[in-house]
Amino acid sequence: AWYRGRGYWLAPPALRMKEGKVRIEVPASDEWGESQCLGILPSIEAAYHMPARLQSELAERYVRMLNKRLEELVLVEGHRFGALVLEPLVMGAGGMIFVDPLFQRCLVDVVRSREDLFSLSDPPLRDACVNRDADGWRGLPVVYDEVFTGLHRLGFAMGADVLGTPPDINCLAKILTGGVVPMSVTLASDSIFRAFSISDQKTHALLHGHSYTAHPVGCQVTLETLDMLDEMPTKASWDPAWLERMSYAKRLRGIMSLGTVLKLELESSTGGYASDAADDLLRT
């Protein structure tokens, strides 16, 4: 085959409100074994209160599991990783999965603390994992893909506002122009940016570009969008009382909301994009 995947995808715990409570559920997987409920939280607000949740027993369980799984992947299975890439809080491309933010915070913390694992990589990543400035990235570069969720879609500017820890690289797109013209941005910390400027060799530069790089119309629309965001209310959300009532609906497996995003999960024997559950509901 012309392509061989080198990444590894963890099965994340997902949040689902049912009968007024937020359940933390995991699918059957190598990480968790059988599908199960890891815990129940009293409200959506409690699920995203990171300072309190970091002190919980579940945080300790996440850290133990992540350390164990990473050790298996690197030391036993021989994986070599170059970065941690995640969609903060809501995996839009994965089926609107509301990932437990505590799990993502623990994942970032563990990856940044395990230089002993990632310094085993082949050159040049081996040298890049150590001997950096005090404010540089650690373990692996952490990339937040906020193409869908960034810039107030979820009720706050960035995922780091909830997770409580910033990325080393951040990707933004959709809200920059609302899809009117092509535009995206990739933001990087100083330590990441300097990696492309310490050499005089052209091959060490970030030789990347496409037809719409620095597109002037897109750049101007983006500037106008950012000005509008500064003037608009910074937080919008669905009515909590309505969400709680809907969580008791018999046809719903669960409901979740964050900022402007609402997810209604229908009871269905089939899932994914091929499911006809929504059509069946509209016909009734």
Question: For the regions a protein language model found, what residue spans apply to each?
Answer:
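Conserved N-terminal phosphate-binding loop of PLP-dependent enzymes in the Aspartate aminotransferase
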Residues: 1-284
